[in-house]
Amino acid sequence: TGKIKPAYPEDKNISIISSCTKFVIFGQRPVLIGERINPTGKKKFKEALRNNDIPYILNEGITQEEKGAQVLDVNVGLPEIDEVAMMEKVVKELQSVTDLPLQIDTTDPVAMEKALRLYKGKPLINSVNGKQEIMKQIFLLVKKYGGVVVSLTIDEGGIPETAEGRIAIVEKLYKTAAEYGIKAKDIIIDPLA
């Protein structure tokens, strides 16, 4: 009798994020990311964060899902609150009321790790840039927990004026990500146009 070889899954080289029940593929059509769970320019949302009003925050997620969002951005960063604790609460509770994939949006690496540890799926991570210290922090987390990472064309020198300067940062991002075992398909470039 001949030996049958195992069939391994084929890597289709697509950028995909997921919750525990839904997935979103990038690159085929526009992806609608709901950005109402973010305090930037939102007075009521800032108040909800300050008052620990989790039902208000969850309602923002539910409403965005009802209006067609495919991914929910989660940013709870305000200087006067404990971002780590709030990120933990919001990510945990959102997953109980919606099955949309989440975008973890924070500049705090501790809050990001807490969210990634709790997340049930493959998240969108917002964001990394070309600064060496930031790449190290974020790519270590992506390597450990998985995810697709939004990558910004900015580094220690700021945002380059030329396309060539931005391309150089993109190349540095891809090279550094590869050193951490992160595939190019798990990087989405934001050129900051």
Regions from the language model: what does each represent?
Residues 1-191:
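Domain-level signal for soluble alpha/beta catalytic cores
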